[in-house]
Amino acid sequence: MEQLEYVPNSIARGLSSGKHWILGLVFMRTGADGSVLGVEEASLLYTDIVIRGAETRAAQRGYSLLLSSADDLHPSNLASLMNLTGTVDGLVLLDRILGDDGVAYLSKRIPVVLLAGSGASSSAVTVRVDNEQAMRSLAEHLADAHGVTRFGFVKGSDESPDSVARARAFRETVTRIGGSLADVDVLEADWTSAGGESAMLGRLARSEPLPQAFACANDQTAVGVIYALNARGLNVPDDVLVTGFDDITLTRYFNPSLTTIRQSGGMLGAVAVDVLIAMLDQSDVTPPSVVLPTELVLRASCGCSEGGEAARAPLMAKVPST
């Protein structure tokens, strides 16, 4: 066939096998104001990494990947996804596109993999990272290596199982090690740098002593938090320690370089595709949910050197100047 330069016809292949040879990946739509600039401002770099990993693995396995976006838990999402069932062989849902009832309904009609979900659904297989161990290792490092006793946390979306799991595990660990995580120091953001900046500016406006360290639900949020602190004359890490989650490429070149939790977004997307194809190949067997490991990466924003040598956190809580 190579000598004849034969190229398989995907339509004919689908007719002969009863399959479309197309997988769908649906991710959360960003840019709430609906403008092009709003979409650019709210774009999530980590989502792009996950999509690229899924797309590469799908191609390796002989499938095309159809991308679609949806609003977070919007009532119309189920109807939109049902329309895709005649086009794709299976669906990967990134984060909270559907509630539990919607997932149960959809999964009766087409194989579904929840990517970065809570892992609690009995209706679909979940592929996620070990958020709990990640946040335990981070909180313990801040306390043990830097002497932090006053902690803050900057959340992502309240509807995101990842954000909820990270906040809960961080709180539980801080409580266990005897630290203080007051409610006023849990800030609401939306995964974006702009959201992190806005959350921190709001916190600084209260003119109350700051925690010694803020852990952020993702790297982009941490970048916005650091920007806001710098804008008010506070230095990271001399005045406040800041950490992220994801280890996107930007964090290595940011100043200060960002201490973060490394998770492989590309691997997350690839494994989700592998699990979905396994469900298609063996429709009578449901694969187990998958939890991928993470790694604590120590850099300058928490007071560590690149090699991990730690400096102590500031003992005196900073009061932002007005």
List where the protein language model places each region.
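Alpha-helical recognition/docking segments in bacterial nutrient-uptake
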Residues: I22-E140, L204-A205, P209
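Glycine-rich phosphate/diphosphate-binding loops that line cofactor/substrate pockets in enzymes
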Residues: H141-F151
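Periplasmic-binding protein-like
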Residues: L25, T87-L94, R150-V154, V186, ...
